[in-house]
């Protein structure tokens, strides 16, 4: 049996280096997603879609526990995992230094159907917490908000499912499938 050494948990400085290496990066940010199963599923999908990094706040978020790694099914070894002190400040920094567009997923009066949003170039897709969605401070950093149109009576998805759908649309537009 071969032992796989997991990637270390990275921080804000590592994110700056990553953006220099991948100027058109596709990133996934999770705003206070606390369930390690959801974190693992998001990481697995991010790895499958070629996302360069998953960004989470250091506090009030799930961390890369053995459960999250197991659910990620190898994805935690493929995609960078970055814990930041302040997610809103990190998003503002990305916008200022690398012209990364921040696209939040939420249902509000300004939100576009996800397929109408341009995901080309450097982009970070931000998913909100399982029960409360995006915090107002995180919303304030979003250049655009999008929603996933649904035809059923239930207008809610699990965060990992919604992340998968958002990442698929981004990759479809970026011709990276």
Regions found by a protein language model. Name each.
Residues 48, 67-75, 136-177:
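Structured adenosyl-cofactor binding patch, chiefly the S-adenosyl-L-methionine
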Residues 8-10, 36, 62, 109-111, ...:
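Glycine-rich nucleotide phosphate-binding loop and flanking beta-alpha elements
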Residues 3, 17-112:
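RNA substrate-binding interface of SAM-dependent RNA methyltransferases
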